[in-house]
């Protein structure tokens, strides 16, 4: 059965649906076309839930009617099978209603800018940053998403001090938003001769991609600098000043890009990252103000929170937010993140239901 608070929401919607339908029926379209158009739009939005709820009630009635057939010995076996089928349909319809009535994250349909940075652990942390980059790339391939490296700061052994990528596709943020936080790796580094297990950390930030419709940037607030691009070890790899650094003066947020050969391409990439960073900055600022007003602390998967551990010797991945442990480390690193992400999505839905 649907939770009481959801039934109350549906009853309100049913009442609005009936009222809107009544207003439309009594309205003269020739005299008030604008009102007719507005009411028609409202009715269309309400009708989806109205039809779902009508289907839900029909299944409930069918279940009650089928239960009556259980009293007939000749029809009992057939009725039991039909009840099983109807209960499955009822659960599916409940999920549809709950999903449509649950508040959505406005960013869920957006593409993302994903940033991976080596934390504690030196070269080993940088090497695991490369492993995580590959993991997200494989996951994107499984989903049919477009994956593009925007900026990378490589180390001599093939790791990354920092790497920033864009991932584009259907509902990317709704899947990857849970990856923001500290990822911990426990393994014997290739640089370790004594065979001792080391613990290193990597931070991941997942930002919904933004543009000028999400964030207004005053050109006067930007300081744009150019310099010669350099490779691993600091040697210059370009004789022209193609690298670009853009600083947003009011917030102090600074973005550098040097992977492209032309200054224009690097500038476009830097602005793309800056828009996402500023959107994230202002949203967090707004949330902090709201939390302060409510006098409460809410965990949101911030970068300072340890969210997941990858233990190589035990072939184990543990997500600490939901106490989920999987013994298929290599599969996860090969992009098999569905079990983890679907569990996190279920937890988010559960929390939304509790607070609805």
From Swiss-Prot:
Keywords: Cytoplasm, Methylation, Protein biosynthesis. One of its GO terms (cellular component) is cytoplasm. InterPro entries: PCRF, Pep_chain_release_fac_I, Pep_chain_release_fac_I_sf, Prokaryotic/Mito_RF, RF-1. It comes from the Bacteria. It holds the Pfam family RF-1. The modification N5-methylglutamine is found at residue 235. Its main location: cytoplasm. Methylated by PrmC. Methylation increases the termination efficiency of RF1. One of its GO terms (molecular function) is translation release factor activity, codon specific. The keyword Glycosyltransferase does not apply. It is found in: Cytoplasm. SMART domains: PCRF. NCBIfam families: prfA, PRK00591.1. Belongs to the prokaryotic/mitochondrial release factor family. Peptide chain release factor 1 directs the termination of translation in response to the peptide chain termination codons UAG and UAA. This is Peptide chain release factor 1. The gene is prfA.
């Amino acid at each position: 059965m649907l939770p009481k608070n959801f039934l109350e929401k549906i009853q309100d919607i049913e009442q609005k649906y009936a009222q809107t339908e009544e207003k439309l029926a009594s309205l003269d379209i020739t005299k008030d076309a604008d009102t007719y158009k507005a009411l028609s739009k409202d009715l269309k939005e309400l009708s989806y839930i109205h039809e779902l709820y009508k289907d839900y009630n029909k299944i409930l009635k069918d279940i009650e009617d089928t239960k009556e057939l259980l009293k007939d010995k000749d029809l009992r076996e057939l009725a039991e099978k039909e009840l099983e089928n109807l209960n499955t349909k009822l659960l599916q319809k409940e999920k549809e209603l709950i999903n449509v009535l649950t508040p959505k994250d406005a960013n869920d349909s957006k593409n993302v800018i994903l940033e991976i940075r080596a934390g504690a652990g030196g070269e080993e942390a940088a090497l695991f940053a490369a492993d995580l980059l590959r993991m997200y790339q494989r996951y994107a391939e499984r989903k049919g998403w477009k994956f593009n490296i925007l900026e990378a700061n490589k180390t001599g052994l093939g790791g990354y001090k920092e790497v920033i990528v864009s991932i584009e596709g259907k509902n990317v943020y709704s899947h990857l938003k849970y990856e923001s936080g500290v990822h911990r790796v426990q393994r014997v580094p290739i640089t370790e001769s004594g065979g001792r297990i080391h613990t290193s950390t990597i931070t991941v930030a997942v930002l919904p991609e933004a543009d000028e419709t999400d964030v207004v940037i005053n050109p006067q607030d930007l300081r744009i600098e150019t310099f010669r691009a350099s490779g691993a070890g600091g040697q210059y790899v370009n004789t022209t000043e193609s690298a670009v650094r853009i600083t947003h003066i009011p917030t102090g947020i600074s973005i550098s890009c040097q992977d492209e050969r032309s200054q224009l391409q690097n500038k476009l990439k830097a602005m793309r990252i800056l828009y996402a960073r500023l959107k994230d900055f202002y949203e967090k600022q707004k949330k902090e103000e709201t939390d302060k007003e409510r006098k409460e602390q809410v965990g949101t998967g911030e970068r300072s929170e340890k969210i997941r551990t990858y233990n190589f010797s035990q072939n184990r991945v543990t997500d600490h937010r939901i106490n989920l442990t999987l013994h298929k480390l290599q599969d996860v690193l090969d992009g098999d993140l569905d079990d983890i992400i679907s569990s996190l999505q279920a937890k988010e839905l559960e929390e939304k239901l509790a607070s609805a």
